[in-house]
């Protein structure tokens, strides 16, 4: 929707954002399209750290934001590791951009790291992108994955190892990404405490925007 210029009709994702962020300029005809530039919140982490649980609770409690689970758009066509899943990230940023035009920022829950989003063409449409990574200790994550329902297929050794590796990477590299990620260890806190911590993190950035 937003990528189509109302004046010339061209589809351009690479619109030029004016300094104050109130307009996106069509590179084809120069038309200034007014839009709302809001922050985006990315809630990331390995499988089993509590993203989906937090997402469900936040959707019911966080009325000032739109909370979404990124897996709902996953299709085989997006399984492109050679591009670091670029089309998948661009698609989600485009969805979040359009939703935010209703005046509410989006909280997107799903695995991902800053490098996968910050390089995207659609990134320019957000005032900031804030990243919170849920993590936990190896033993806790292993137990959670192996005790999930069988249909999820998360008890297999290779699946467990893959997500242990990603979890460790987040812990080791959170401060070195651009921008840095905030870490939240969910191992020793309840679900309610975890959700409350995510809420505080979101509100702290909303109040600072």
Question: Which sequence ranges carry the predicted segments?
Answer:
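Short cysteine-rich clusters marking metal-coordination/redox-active sites
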Residues: 5-8, 26-29
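Conserved lysine of the Walker
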Residues: 51
């Amino acid at each position: 929707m937003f990528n189509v210029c109302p004046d010339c009709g061209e589809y351009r994702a690479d619109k030029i954002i004016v300094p104050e962020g109130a307009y996106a300029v069509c590179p084809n005809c120069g038309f200034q399209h007014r839009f709302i530039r809001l922050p985006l919140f990315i809630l990331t982490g390995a499988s089993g750290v509590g993203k989906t649980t937090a997402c469900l609770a936040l959707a019911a409690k966080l009325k000032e934001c739109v909370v979404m689970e990124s897996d709902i758009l996953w299709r085989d066509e997006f399984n492109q590791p050679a591009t670091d899943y670029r089309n998948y990230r661009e698609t989600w940023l485009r969805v979040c951009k359009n939703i935010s035009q209703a005046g509410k920022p989006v909280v997107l829950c799903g695995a991902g790291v800053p490098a996968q989003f910050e390089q995207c063409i659609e990134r320019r449409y957000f005032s900031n992108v804030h990243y919170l990574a849920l993590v936990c200790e190896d033993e806790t994550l292993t137990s959670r994955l192996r005790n999930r329902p069988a249909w999820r297929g998360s008890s297999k050794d290779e699946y467990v190892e893959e997500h242990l590796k990603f979890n460790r990477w987040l812990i080791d590299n959170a401060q070195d990404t651009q921008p840095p990620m905030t870490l939240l260890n969910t191992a020793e806190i309840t679900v309610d405490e975890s959700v409350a911590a995510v809420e505080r993190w979101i509100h702290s950035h909303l109040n600072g925007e």
